[in-house]
Amino acid sequence: MAKLEITLKRSVIGRPEDQRVTVRTLGLKKTNQTVVHEDNAAIRGMINKVSHLVSVKEQ
């Protein structure tokens, strides 16, 4: 299964609580931090919800 490299590009300051929780659940705390996750439906859904805050690369 493919892996996704997810980077937080924009701050969560001033964002709704559900977006903050989603970013935190992805494992991101600080801007420009990068995490790697397996590519599955749950992760894709979270990325879709905060797509304006993150950038995604396939590995």
Swiss-Prot record:
GO terms for molecular function: structural constituent of ribosome. CDD domains: Ribosomal_L30. InterPro entries: Ribo_uL30_ferredoxin-like_sf, Ribosomal_uL30_bac-type, Ribosomal_uL30_CS, Ribosomal_uL30_ferredoxin-like. GO terms for biological process: translation. It comes from the Bacteria. Keywords: Ribonucleoprotein, Ribosomal protein. One of its GO terms (cellular component) is cytosolic large ribosomal subunit. The keyword GTP-binding does not apply. The keyword Ribosomal protein applies. Part of the 50S ribosomal subunit. Belongs to the universal ribosomal protein uL30 family. This is Large ribosomal subunit protein uL30.
